[in-house]
UniProtKB/Swiss-Prot annotation:
The modification Phosphotyrosine is found at residue 106. It is found in: Cytoplasm; Lysosome. SMART domains: BBOX (SM00336). GO terms for biological process: innate immune response; negative regulation of protein localization to nucleus; negative regulation of transcription by RNA polymerase II. This is Tripartite motif-containing protein 29. It comes from the Eukaryota. The keyword Zinc-finger applies. Residues 1-71 are annotated as: Disordered. Disruption phenotype: Absence of TRIM29 enhances macrophage production of type I interferons and protects mice from infection with influenza virus. It comes from Mus musculus (Mouse).
Length: 587
């Protein structure tokens, strides 16, 4: 294209854009001004690299290639226009467009006359939008100056998961045309990502020495301040948020700020400490899991032994019941045999009597057959002289006590069931209802010995906040009553009115300087005296022996050393007055 003046820009650097209008066929500008005779410049909007003496494509001779591109005889120079679009994910990208819609061999390049107004870009910090697309207004949270913005550090954040998921995708080079290559670095100054080929100017050129190269970044807008549109290069330690340099002088004025690199190093140290603590906790949990696996085996073995004992005892019980049953059965059989023997004796006696009666009957039948009357009478007289009536048959009564035996056995069964149920209920409720595993009352690594030695005597005093009332209760004699010093109001705690009271309370023994409780609006820390930290407005300025800071001893990094006990860093120190009234010696 002869004498063409093309300019490529993505809007990242407004200074690099060339706002000149395309020249007409005669070589003059469309607005009538004189054409610029300087060399054409091609500006890379991503890297800011400007090369002189180069044009888009090869130069066309006069009259060549015109008929191939345009059907009419009118020669119109190409108009290159960049359109910025925003997709659903909020990512910005640029494309080239023209009025007639003819596409060049290059991706996004359109040739033809432009009937649309030129692309205009907003000022820095404002959202740049395309006039060829529907306007998309971003949702920006307006924060008033001085308003505190704190991070809550949630355990699981969907935005963090989305960023991690998007970060796993490949970042493409912004300078490649057509087949985009994978980006290897991103430049914060150019706000673009480059592949190995397009990264060479940043590595070799002297103009790009000050450019900061990072790992490929997908969303550069996330690194910009939502209020000012500048890159967030600072970190506010007061509000725990990333800010730009304009925020440091406006919303975060007089706040403690550091660079994001320093804040990252500090947070990485904190993160490493948390990882070590989590690793120690994981090791502790794994040890507990191993211990509980052994306990599970012990529980199974113990339960198996208990089942064996149960089976053995109930087998013995059933065997004893079988013995008792056999004894009752033997008694029944013995009684049956005795009764049968008695019946046999009775039957034998009756058979003997029946035999005698049969003999008497036969004698009388023989006498009845005598035909001689004299002989019959003589024999009859002799028979009747010894005759007597047969005695009556003996009577017997059989006692069948089956119902009585059944009632006795029923009572025995009820008694056995009652005794068995009573013992089984006792075993189930008293012995078997107790769980194998019982949760301890002291948890979270608490010092059991320390807590047990004092909670029994002070009740619920451990829930008292860090105020003067909490620590003043320990300033009384160790053996006396635990009466805390409670002033009526903080304003009465002045040095003039309470100096005498504190001297009487603490004593004057030793070389300690008398100090009293003072009410201050803010907690003031002193290097030589301990102070009570927290939400309290009181600062403790007592004797050095009244409160001491426990410095933990250096221990090797083992899983046991990670267990911190309750009140291991800051414990109240009791005063032992001893025999003297004014003594404040340490025990």
């Amino acid at each position: 294209m002869e004498g063409a003046d093309a300019c490529r820009s993505n809007g990242a650097s407004p200074e690099a854009r060339d706002t000149r209008s395309p020249p007409g066929p005669s070589g003059s500008l469309e607005n009538g001004t004189k054409a610029d005779s300087k060399d054409t410049k091609t500006t890379n909007g991503h890297s800011g690299e400007v090369t002189e003496g180069k044009t888009l494509g090869s130069a066309l001779k006069s009259g060549e290639g015109k008929s191939g591109l345009f059907s009419s005889n009118e020669w119109r120079r190409p108009i290159i226009q960049f359109v910025e679009s925003v997709d659903d994910k909020g990512s910005s990208y640029f494309s080239m467009d023209s009025a007639e819609g003819r596409r060049s061999p290059y991706a996004g390049l359109q040739l033809g006359a432009s009937k649309k107004p030129p692309v205009t870009f907003a000022e820095k910090g404002e959202l740049r939008k395309s006039i060829f697309s529907e306007p998309r207004k971003p949702t920006v949270t307006i924060v008033e100056p001085g308003e505190v913005r704190r991070n809550s550090y949630p355990r699981a954040d969907s935005s963090l998961l989305a960023r991690a998921k998007s970060g796993s995708e490949e970042v493409l080079c912004d300078s490649c045309i057509g087949n985009k290559q994978k980006a290897v670095k991103s430049c914060l100054v150019c706000q673009a990502s480059f592949c190995e080929l397009h990264l060479k100017p940043h590595l070799e050129g002297a103009a790009f020495r000050d450019h900061q190269l990072l790992e490929p970044i997908r969303d550069f807008e996330a690194r910009k301040c939502p209020l000012h549109g500048k890159t967030m290069e600072l970190f506010c330690q007061t509000d725990q948020t990333c800010i730009c340099y304009l925020c440091m002088f406006q919303e975060h004025k007089n706040h403690s700020t550091v660079t994001v690199e320093e804040a990252k190093a500090e947070k990485e140290t904190e993160l490493s400490l948390q990882k070590e603590q989590l690793q120690l906790k994981i090791i502790e949990i794994e040890d507990d899991v191993e211990k509980w696996q052994k306990e599970k085996d012990r529980i199974k073995s113990f339960t198996t032994n208990e089942k064996a004992i149960l089976e053995q005892n109930f087998r013995d019980l059933v065997r004893e019941l079988e013995k008792q049953k056999e004894e009752v059965r033997a008694a029944l059989e013995q009684r049956e045999q005795d009764a049968v023997d008695q019946v046999k004796v009775i039957v034998d006696a009756l058979d003997e009597r029946a035999k005698v009666l049969h003999e008497d009957k036969q004698t009388r039948e023989q006498l009845h057959n005598i035909s001689d009357s004299v002989l019959f009478l003589q024999e009859f007289g002799a028979l009747m002289s010894n005759y007597s009536l047969p005695p009556p048959l003996p009577t017997y009564h059989v006692l069948l006590e089956g119902e009585g035996l059944g009632q006795s056995l029923g009572n025995c069964k009820d008694d056995l069931l009652n005794v068995c149920m009573r013992h089984v209920e006792k075993m189930c409720k008293a012995d078997l209802s107790r769980n194998f595993i019982e949760r301890n009352h002291m948890e979270n690594g608490g010092d059991h010995r320390y807590m047990n030695s004092y909670t029994s005597s002070y009740g619920n005093e451990w829930s008292t906040p860090d105020t003067m009332k909490r620590y003043s209760m320990y300033l009384t004699p160790k053996g006396g009553g635990r009466t805390s010093y409670q002033p009526s109001s903080p304003s009465r705690l002045s040095k003039e009115t309470n100096q005498k009271n504190f001297n009487n309370l603490y004593g004057t023994k030793g070389n300690y300087t008398s100090r009293v409780w003072e009410y201050t609006s803010t907690v003031q820390n002193s290097e030589d005296m301990p102070t009570v930290q927290g939400n309290s407005s009181f600062s403790l300025k007592g004797f050095p022996s009244l409160l001491r800071s426990q410095v933990p001893k250096a221990q090797p990094q083992t899983w046991k050393s990670g267990k911190q006990t309750l009140l291991s860093h800051y414990r109240p120190f009791y005063v032992n007055k001893g025999s003297g009234i004014g003594s404040n010696e340490a025990p």
